[in-house]
Amino acid sequence: YEDLETALATVPKFKMAHMNPQAIEFMEREIVLASERYIGKSVFPQELEGVQIGAYLLVTLDGNSEDEVDALIEQAAELVLEAGAIDVLVADTSAKMKDAWAARSSFLEAIMEETKLLDECDVVVPVNKIAEYLTFVNKTGEECGLVIKSFGHAGDGNLHIYQCSNDLEEE
């Protein structure tokens, strides 16, 4: 997605389409870049079709058969493209799935590696309010001289928000 707001606006559409993904994770560009520096591997594209990627959704689908999963993938791809995704990348091998989730799992360590002082806040907000809440948090962080890095479970509104600073003292 070009921006986080567009990515997050997609999430409720999965429920409206009666899809039930196993997981829907959101990731901002900066946290993906930090992860890549930390693990030493590029997993997610930085640019597609000449457009810089600003945010990502990592969607996990499950079904009773390969045909059912393939149909869900097609339905999900159509849904996200209609909602403004730049493109759809399918992790169609176990290696690609492992790489995607390994990158996602490294986010906290990547933040810690690059940040002198950080504090974590886990919150749960309604799925349709995630973008609004993160806009508020980012604006407040900026006003306080903090860099905010966030990622989380967009499917259930469980957000991991990190207030980061390399300039402030702990006191």
Give the residues covered by each predicted segment.
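Noncatalytic alpha-helical scaffold of FAD-dependent oxidoreductases
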Residues: 1-171
